[in-house]
Amino acid sequence: MAQAEAVQGKIVQCIGAVVDVEFPRDKMPKIYDALKFEGSALTLEVQQQLGDGVVRTIALGSSDGLRRGLIVTNTQAPITVPVGKATLGRIMDVLGAPIDERGPVDQTLTASIHRKAPAYDELSPSQDLLETGIKVIDLVCPFAKGGKVGLFGGAGVGKTVNMMELINNIAKAHSGLSVFAGVGERTREGNDFYHEMADSGVVNLEKLENSKVAMVYGQMNEPPGNRLRVALTGLTIAESFRDEGRDVLFFVDNIYRYTLAGTEVSALLGRMPSAVGYQPTLAEEMGRLQERITSTKVGSITSIQAVYVPADDLTDPSPATTFAHLDSTVVLSRDIASLGIYPAVDPLDSTSRQLDPNVVGQEHYNVARAVQGTLQRYKELRDIIAILGMDELAPEDKLAVARARKIQRFLSQPFHVAEVFTGSPGKYVPLSETIRGFKMIVNGEADHLPEQAFYMVGTIDEAFEKAKKVA
């Protein structure tokens, strides 16, 4: 097939990250077409057609040095990024260019970052549980293989640490591949993650093709266009592995920054903001991303997404829009973190559609509901205790409070990724042990133990051992 004739235009206006480019009227670029400059790595993505041959674009990179009259070439295709084995063990930016100083990425296989979600008849829902080794998650909000999970939390309650522990427990034991998309987060965290993966062998620095993870970063210091599109770049790589018939883990840190980048781009394009200043297309943008993160009859994508909650307000439009797309929600609470209980997961706020007796089994379901019931009773009694003290409670309420406090402490657990800070070795607790431990507490088999014996231990047997030392 003959090469399409190159269509060129020139810049007519440049305001920050927004660049207007004029083309011949009969050769206007399509929405999402990528435009390139000669001798520069900068790419523009078409967002609007203004008429009279002028298109409005967003710069995916710094627009410093751009001026009116510069010649721009239309690639006549959306942004494409390298996919497949060549991406394993590599760190790339939004355009698929390497940023790990380990040479170019093989471009033999490439794919457009914009594509339709799989058709309804191609989807394959899964009922299999994904064991994480984290007690509170496995008990009250279990993950589904091929499902979508959100880690919700305000600033500094442990979203990234929880995400790193999940990567540590799942990705290392997981025989498939992982893709990590760093969307608008700290560069330091991205760097730490890379070195952690290299130390654990998930990234094989000697033979990169034997690595099990691909990394795509568009960090906080980058222009909004990069932060908006980097999630799609990571997703495109994950989709290509899924379409090869593999089971893929897709980690996103942080979905809120994706929304925020969309807000910035929307404002730059002159759209009227909607509630709380967000873009009017918030639900559509979120849906377009989330609908592509799905499992088909060929392979699966299990996605774990950190979601920042501004001002700890879960009703904010950004986290509220994300909720609708998830199978499991893990809500991190500042109140629980302030008690020194980590992971600071709120067992009463976190949900999972997997917590169903037909999926997890009757025993698991009963224990989880009994744990939640005991904690809920403690929550209701807290005001009475604060005013009148423990002595005024009925004997059965005193017992419920004692058990709830033990459950609360038993929900804490030392993490592998936090060993450096805590000094205590991380614990991986199998699901069967988690159920056995909580069942014993709920049934009163651990009533004689002091509550500090349950703090920061793995299994219930460790709590019994610790009680002997405490005594």
UniProtKB/Swiss-Prot annotation:
Coiled coil located at which positions? none
Q: Which SUPFAM superfamilies match?
A: C-terminal domain of alpha and beta subunits of F1 ATP synthase, N-terminal domain of alpha and beta subunits of F1 ATP synthase, P-loop containing nucleoside triphosphate hydrolases
**Compartment(s) where it occurs, according to its Swiss-Prot or TrEMBL record:** Cell inner membrane
Q: Which CDD domains match?
A: ATP-synt_F1_beta_C (cd18110), ATP-synt_F1_beta_N (cd18115), F1-ATPase_beta_CD (cd01133)
Task: Establish whether keyword Ion transport is in the entry.
Answer: yes
In this chain, ATP is annotated as bound at: 153-160
Question: Which UniProt keywords are given for this protein, alphabetically ordered?
Answer: ATP synthesis, ATP-binding, Cell inner membrane, Cell membrane, CF(1), Hydrogen ion transport, Ion transport, Membrane, Nucleotide-binding, Translocase, Transport
Q: Could you tell me the EC number(s) of this protein?
A: 7.1.2.2
Source domain of life: Bacteria
Q: Which GO terms describe its cellular component?
A: plasma membrane; proton-transporting ATP synthase complex
Spell out the reaction equation it catalyses.
ATP + H2O + 4 H(+)(in) = ADP + phosphate + 5 H(+)(out)
User: How does this protein assemble?
Assistant: F-type ATPases have 2 components, CF(1) - the catalytic core - and CF(0) - the membrane proton channel. CF(1) has five subunits: alpha(3), beta(3), gamma(1), delta(1), epsilon(1). CF(0) has three main subunits: a(1), b(2) and c(9-12). The alpha and beta chains form an alternating ring which encloses part of the gamma chain. CF(1) is attached to CF(0) by a central stalk formed by the gamma and epsilon chains, while a peripheral stalk is formed by the delta and b chains.
Q: What is the purpose of this protein?
A: Produces ATP from ADP in the presence of a proton gradient across the membrane. The catalytic sites are hosted primarily by the beta subunits.
Q: Which family does it belong to?
A: Belongs to the ATPase alpha/beta chains family.
What is the recorded name of this protein? ATP synthase subunit beta
Q: Identify the coding gene.
A: atpD
